[in-house]
Amino acid sequence: MGARASVLTGGKLDRWEKVRLRPGGRKRYMMKHLVWASRELERFAKRHHGEQQSKTESNSGSREGGASQGASASAGISGNYPLVQNAQGQMVHQAISPRTLNAWVKVVEEKAFSPEVIPMFSALSEGALPQDVNTMLNAVGGHQGAMQVLKEVINEEAAEWDRLHPTHAGPIAPGQLREPRGSDIAGTTSTLQEQIGWTTANPPIPVGDVYRRWVILGLNKVVRMYCPVSILDIRQGPKEPFRDYVDRFYKTLRAEQASQEVKNWMTDTLLVQNANPDCKQILKALGPGATLEEMMTACQGVGGPSHKARVLAEAMSMVQNQGRADVFFQKGQGAGPKRKIKCFNCGKEGHLARNCKAPRRKGCWRCGQEGHQMKDCTGRQVNFFRERLAFPQREARQLCAEQNRTNGPTDRELWVPGGREEPGEERGREQSISTNLPQITLWQRPLIPVKVEGQLCEALLDTGADDTVIERIQLQGLWKPKMIGGIGGFIKVKQFDNVHIEIEGRKVVGTVLVGPTPVNIIGRNILTQLGCTLVFPISSIETVPVKLKPGMDGPKVKQWPLSAEKIKALTEICQEMEKEGKISKIGPENPYNTPIFAIKKKDSTKWRKLVDFRELNKRTQDFWEVQLGIPHPAGLKKKKSVTVLDVGDAYFSCPLDKDFRKYTAFTIPSINNETPGVRYQYNVLPQGWKGSPSIFQSSMTKILEPFREKNPDITIYQYMDDLYVGSDLEIDQHRKKVEELRQHLLKWGFTTPDKKHQKEPPFLWMGYELHPDKWTVQPIQLPEKEVWTVNDIQKLIGKLNWASQIYPGIKIKQLCKLIRGTKKLTDVVPLTPEAELELAENREIVSTPVHGVYYDPDKELIAEIQKQGNCQWTYQIFQEPHKNLKTGKYARQRSAHTNDIRQLAEAVQKIATESIVIWGKTPKFRLPVQKESWEAWWAEYWQATWIPEWEFINTPPLVKLWYSLETEPIPTTDTYYVDGAANRETKTGKAGYVTDKGKQKIISLENTTNQQAELKALLLALQDSDQQVNIVTDSQYVLGIIQSQPDHSESELVNQIIEELIKKEKIYLSWVPAHKGIGGNEQVDKLVSAGIRKVLFLDGIDRAQEEHERYHSNWKAMASDFNLPPIVAKEIVAHCDKCQVKGEAMHGQVDCSPGIWQVDCTHLEGKVIIVAVHVASGYIEAEVIPAETGQETAYFLLKLAGRWPVKTIHTDNGPNFTSAAVKAACWWADIKQEFGIPYNPQSQGVVESLNKELKKIIGQVRDQAEHLKTAVQMAVFIHNFKRKGGIGGYTAGERIIDIIATDIQTSELQKQILKVQKFRVYYRDSRDPIWKGPATLLWKGEGAVVIQDQGELKVVPRRKAKIIRDYGKQMAGDDCVASRQNED
């Protein structure tokens, strides 16, 4: 390896010559160590052959030794496992040594299929024959999942070998070796002598090297599975336990460099998609909302060691019967001409199936039949354990019989090709397959008579059994022992091959196992040859259960009168719908009714039936809108072939829940009440009912799912009844697929009328016009009107909004101003000059057609924004210049006072959201703003949670900040204290300022408010001050407006202030609390308050501030405890530098039952704090624990349960919470433990939020405590008893006590109510002497009782009521004792 000739020696060689065996690997090896290892491997591999070689050489002499060497060299055989020539001149094989096997097993156990395993296998198996390789593989005890994956790869490679090396028909010449098949190379069907013969032949066939190459391919696949570099590489092995797969999945997921949203998506999709087929079927059955706990419970026992046990049992039986004679496959002819490799999957030449990028073709690659994959095919299979006993050779690609049927049975049935014999037919002749196939129903056990080698018996057709097992039958011929696994364990059976079986008149030959079985079974090995298929009948579309809202009844709205022509039209429409089964006639027993009416269709004389479902919609349960928006053509990828379909009578093809149909009843009246009205109810989804869109979308998705899975190369966009079908197929193939789709929909009752079947462009779809390489909106005509109504303006704005997605530059702000306020649709609206100008510009824009292009996933998305003025923005999203994907506008003004940069930021967030919806990613932004202005804004704009990737583009007008506020007071300039006041009753006020130099100015105001007066005072100070000024105000309103740095406003007064601000060189604005004795502020406050407002003496301010400095109470607590106005309490909190709250997190809904606590561990200053939160009240228990262990956690839970009633705790899946100690504590204290979703903090939302709150309070009081545990308890005290708010305005401590007390009172009250309800009341009115009743007793007071009689609530004086216990119907006689018992 070059170390001997190195110029470096000693320590230098050690320092510099370092080698990584694996690219990117951590371990590095010294060159001399690698040289030593190579010598040791070479010496070690030859050591155990030395003795026999020396004997051979001494007996046969140098000539034989030379010949042996020559033979070996010519065959290219390594010295690791030499083929030596014995004394008789025969080539013999030296078996693999135990030391080599031990080294291999140790590698696998220590490395666990890490990448190092592959070079180790390659080195240890150098020169090995297939038998040696199988010996190595059999030595691996565990890792059956990996072995199964390896076995599948070998099966695929063996099948590929058979395809590329076909055998020739005819006998083999004497002395000539047969051609090796794939299973021969794998050592399954070949002897050791045959392997030696192939290896030493001239020319040689290196079967050992070929087999090693297959194994290395399989090991690569296993290594990728066990050591993934990305979450996308995680796959569950076929026999791998689901638990192990989940462990690997989450371990890799933690290391993924992705956002939490992406990780959540990976968990929701990849975990199920990459499970093995058995687990995936179970997981899909659980539904999309299944928790990880439910998944692991459902998949328990799937995979694992059971497969390994069965294989080992079979191997043991093979070993015990090694004395049996070997019977080999018949030898074939020499190899034919080499052919190009061809993929089993896609049929294309040039690559193998394992490297194919196309979606996997359904069905078996070997026999072509669906229902199994090649690895499960009943043809020849490779097994690591060598089966040396006799079994017949099968054709590798023999196709099973398959029948094409058009009419399926109504029940789930087994179909067997070949009918029963007719009485007059000869029983001995073979029957031809007819269309009159025997049908065996599965409503009962399918037991049928079977002839096995002429012996009649009864057997069960079992599609779940691999093998055919018969009991108590005598068969002739050779047999071999076998052990099979059943429900009760393993049973020993005899395996007979080539047995003749006759079922339903059809004869087949197959393998039968004879042994003790509870029932005779015909398994899949025979059913497949019979062509037997399991038929699942296609049922009608599954109905979605629907209910009314709780406590509501159906609609009972009377039908209003209708004209004669409408009654006639409705009668004809309903008669036709009844024939089609869409509606059914009902009788008078249905008490519900919804009014109907009729309108004429546009441009037609035909009538259209409408049902006024408004009342039913109010009473129907809410539905989740399955599809939240319409698909956009800018998100479509360019397709070679496109078709647009429309589903006819979409809603009327979906059935309505039978229990809900009665609520859709309606009535067709008669003229002059000639006859009773004809009553109908809907059997299908009605038009206008709130549930129809969601149910239809869900049903259509389920129906299209099988077609999508079968045709992954077809893109189908589905929105309601519009279908877009695109593909990259040639037009003829594409149209065939479209016809398949139409037939698929037709089977489910959905028609696609030819009238709306669009085959050629342009395609009209969802209001768009699609061309092969571009798209646009359908032609837009803006109306020309002299008089505009509100309704006309609304329609016009709708058209312009629709056009703006491809026509850049459209503005609608002035048009929207025309219809502000509450106006009738028919009110006439005069166009303002600004609106007329805006409309004219828009006409000019839409007069020239504009087209968009389709999305290319390989190119970058770019969004460019321009300012149009007047708070309006336009943008274009494109991938290539001048080829827009789509355009849009933004004109929303969230605040009355704003600036261009804030609006630009809002527009960027809107475009980013839109891009994620359409393309799944955000674009790169080009913004008309200087970098300094943009970064200055974002630095202060703390509400921002995301800053986009962007670049500057010089597109006038540029956006900039027109002025900025200083962060520190300006020392050399005047300070203006400003204030304003107004009287709410008289609307009069004053505004003014006082400077630190004694200058002052006060003006009087009319028809003003406090806020306007405050702003006017600021304006006065700005107008009278120099270029640099300090301004102090006590108004949060003024401070909030100016600190947002607006450059335009809807308020004229604010616009004047902005103009003055722009003129200044430097401005410093500060806030101080009012009425605190602050010099200038107090002075100006007295000036402007004189005669305007009454200032209350708030003596609680000082005490409130003192308490806040100590406990940092929130404003609600101070307002309540010290009788302060909310504004004053808020100002005290806002002025505290430790209580500047920057927004609050949004929370979802959690279970707030009284006994539920959320528990979590958080970390601070390197220590562990365990926190328990009472969910309903927000009350906290927390303490510092020595370590995050199960023992400490259990001790804390027991203390918590000793203080408060704890019914349920909700924790995460941390090891301390899942420990046995915690489980034991919960069991003892009778606490139910629930777990959140792993790695999803939202499932622990309450405690996660309060962890942050607790840390914030600790930070506020940390300097008051020496130890962290002291600060934690101080923070708990402050949170529980010094912070008010939430439900009831209580502190958390008051709230938990109130909740527990209320819960106890409610429970006791419920007991009393249940006790009271056991009594019945007889009563009488003052005017009626007859006793009435019995009525139900609801409440018993001191002077009266509350009863319910026939649904009516009544209050009856105690003296006029008799209360008796309800003893049941057996004592209901008039003279019974109960009738005379009076509770009084």
UniProtKB/Swiss-Prot annotation:
One Gene Ontology term from the biological process aspect of the record: DNA integration
Positions bearing the site annotation: Cis/trans isomerization of proline peptide bond: 170-171
Positions with a binding annotation for Mg(2+) 1: 646, 721-722
Lipidation (N-myristoyl glycine): 2
Location of the region described as RT 'primer grip' in the Swiss-Prot/TrEMBL record: 763-771
Active site: 462 (for protease activity)
Motif position, Tryptophan repeat motif: 934-950
Motif (Nuclear localization signal): 26-32
Modification after translation (UniProt): Specific enzymatic cleavages by the viral protease yield mature proteins. The protease is released by autocatalytic cleavage. The polyprotein is cleaved during and after budding, this process is termed maturation. Proteolytic cleavage of p66 RT removes the RNase H domain to yield the p51 RT subunit. Capsid protein p24 is phosphorylated.
Domain notes: The p66 RT is structured in five subdomains: finger, palm, thumb, connection and RNase H. Within the palm subdomain, the 'primer grip' region is thought to be involved in the positioning of the primer terminus for accommodating the incoming nucleotide. The RNase H domain stabilizes the association of RT with primer-template.
Protein name: Gag-Pol polyprotein
Source organism per UniProt: Simian immunodeficiency virus (isolate CPZ GAB1) (SIV-cpz)
Lineage, opening ranks: Viruses, Riboviria, Pararnavirae, Artverviricota, Revtraviricetes
The gene coding this protein: gag-pol
